[in-house]
């Protein structure tokens, strides 16, 4: 069973675009449907970890909103961080899924039981499942739904919405 999902931010939770306002503040767009899926996943007692190569106050804010307690930014070696999280949670890569979109996600995607990439990820990433949705446009929701359905938890999970 998948107990934890590892999420990349740029290109997975967002569409990989960064916008700066007139004050130089960074802005990103997050898909609300991804957020609902994450919240419902957490209500099942599952875990979520954000591991991203960049640092952004916006990511911290989004993680707070969704009550994600594992948030690691400015990470060079995502595999090493994922290993530490799994150790802390008493889990292994056999209990993990991950979504990534670029070369810096390769090692973690190769290690997990179920790997995903958004429709617009680089083609060189070899994953178990290529999603139909683009990053920042429902890819994380699609990933969670596929996991939930494969583990026969969809009815319980979907009740979290009502």
Give residue ranges: language-model regions.
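Alpha-helical substrate-recognition element adjacent to the catalytic core
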Residues: 1-77, 160
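Mg2+-dependent phosphoryl-transfer enzymes with acidic/Ser/Thr/Gly-rich catalytic loops
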Residues: 24-28, 66, 70, 79-162
């Amino acid at each position: 069973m998948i107990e934890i999902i590892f999420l990349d931010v740029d290109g997975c939770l967002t569409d990989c675009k960064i916008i700066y306002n007139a004050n130089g503040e960074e802005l990103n767009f997050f898909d609300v449907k991804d957020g609902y899926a994450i919240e419902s996943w957490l209500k099942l007692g599952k875990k979520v970890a954000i591991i991203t190569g960049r640092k952004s106050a916006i990511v911290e804010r989004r993680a707070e909103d969704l009550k994600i307690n594992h948030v690691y930014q400015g990470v060079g070696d995502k595999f090493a961080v994922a290993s530490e999280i799994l150790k802390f949670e008493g889990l292994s890569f056999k209990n993990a899924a991950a979504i990534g979109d670029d070369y810096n996600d390769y090692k973690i995607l190769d290690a997990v039981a179920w790997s995903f990439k958004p429709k617009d990820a680089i083609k060189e990433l070899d994953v178990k499942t290529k999603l139909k949705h683009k990053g920042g446009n429902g890819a994380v929701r699609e990933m969670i739904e596929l996991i939930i359905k494969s583990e026969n938890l969809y009815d319980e999970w979907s009740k979290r919405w009502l």
